Amino acid sequence: MVSFVALIPLFPIVGFFLLLPLGKKLGYPKAGWLGTTAIFLSFVASVITWVGLLARTGTHRVFVDHLFTWMNVGSLKLGIDLYLDPLSMTMVLFVTGVATIIHAYSIGYMKGDPRFHQFFVYLNLFVFSMIVLVLAGNIPLAFVGWEGVGACSYFLISFWFEKPSAATAGKKAFIVNRIGDFGFLLGSFLLFYWVGSLNYVNLFGGHLILSKGSATAIALLFFLGAAGKSAQLPLFTWLVDAMEGPTPVSALIHAATMVTAGVYLMARLAPILRLAPTASMVIAIVGVLTAFVAAAAATSQDDIKKVLAYSTVSQLGYMFLAVGTGAYVAAIFLMVTHAFYKALLFLGSGSVIHSMHDEQDIKKMGRLRRYMPITSVTFIIGWLSIAGFPPFSGFWSKGDVLTAAFQKSPLLWLVGALTAILTAYYMGREVMLVFFGDSRWSAISGSGHQGGHEVGEHEGDMHVSAPHESPRIMTLPLIILAVLAVLGGLLNLPFASSTRFL
C-alpha cells in the first residue's frame, strides 16, 4: 500500500511538467486529456491506498511514508513525509475524484481558448499543491502546499488577465490570503517553541502537553490562517471576486481545493483545539456569523455565480461551526458532501453561461429547463442537496452540524437553522429565475463572447440564437456529480456503522 502513496502527488506533478513543454504542441483536446489523465491516475492511486488503509484497524490506520530528509538543523528535524490516516485519505479521495470530473468538464468548456494548454498546466499544479497540503507529515511541508494552492488560485482567478477586473480579483485573493498566512506562520513558530516539534507523529501520536493559554494562542493564530484561506469574516471578500476566473476554476476552488484547506487544517489540529475551549468557541461564533451574513447577502444577488460564491462562504461557516463545537467528523462530512453539490452547481452554472452566450444575470434568463433538460435536472438536484432536503446528501451532513451546535449552545443552533432557511430560499430563487417562469432572454445578443471570454463549444463557427444543451463532455460530469450529491449521505449515516471511516 505504501508504494502507492507517493504516486498520489507524483501523477499531477508529472502532468504539470509534461504539459509545460508539450501542452501547446498537443493543443486541443490532447493537452486537456493529458492533464485529466494525470489527475485520474492520482485518484486511482488514492482508491488503492484507501482500500489498503480500510483493511487496517485502530492505530494501524496511521502511518508515515518517509521519502527523504528535508531539514536537520539543531532540534528541528523535518522530512518529506506523507502522513496517512483516515482524515488525510478522506480528503485526498474527494480532492482527486472531484478534480478529475472538473478537469474533464474543462476540456469542453475551455475549447477555443488560445491558452487552453496553459489552463491545464495550472490545474495540475493546483491539485498537486492541495495533495501536498493534505498528505504532509509536518506543518512546514503543509505550508508549502498551503502556499502552492494560494499561488495557483492567483494564476487561475486572473487567467483572463486581459480583463482588469480579473487581474484585480487575482491580486485581491493573493493579498488577503497573506494576512492569513501571517497567522499560520506565527502559530507554527509558537508551536515549535512550546512543544519542540512540528511533525504530526510527535504532535499527535501521544499526549500533547500545552497550557490552556498556549493552546488558545496557537489555535487562534492557525484559525487566522484558516479564515483567510477558507473565507471567513472578515476575510471573505476575495472569494466573491474570484468569480472572475473561468467557471471550472470556481468549481475547483469552491469544491475541492483552496477554501477547504482551512477547514482541513483546523480538523488536523483538533488535539490542540481540545485544549483550547475559548478558541473553539470563537471559531464556532465566527463560523455561524459568517454562515448567516453570507446567506443573507446571497438573497440579493442576481449574478448566477455570485449567488454560489456567497453560498460557499456560508457553507464554510457551517464547517467552522462544526469544528468549533468539537464535531470534527461532521465538519469533514459536510466538506465532502459540499464538494459534490457545490461542484455540481458551479459546473451547472457554467453550462448555463455557455448556453446563454456569457449572460450571468439570472433576471435575464428563465424557462431554460425546456432547452437544457440535463443541466436543469442536475442543477435542481444540487439545489435540493444544499438546501438539506431528505434524502439528499446535504440533509445528513448539515443535520449533523446543527445537532452538534444545539448540544453546545441553542443560540448557535438557532442562527444555524435560520441560515438553513435562507439557503433554501436563495437557491430556490436562483433555480426558479433560471429554469422556470417566462423566457427573459430574447434580447441576448449572439454576436460573440463578452470581455474575457467564457469559452465553450459552439455550433459551427456561429453562436446560436436560442439556449441549447451543452455538449456531452460537459453534461456527463454533471450527471456523475448529481449521483454523488444524492448518494453522498451514505458515507456517514448514523445507523450504518460499517460505512463510518473517519
Q: What do these predicted ranges mean?
A:
Residues 4-7, 14, 18, 34, ...:
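Residue-level signal for short hydrophobic patches within transmembrane helices
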Residues 455-458, 464-502:
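Hard-cation-handling environments
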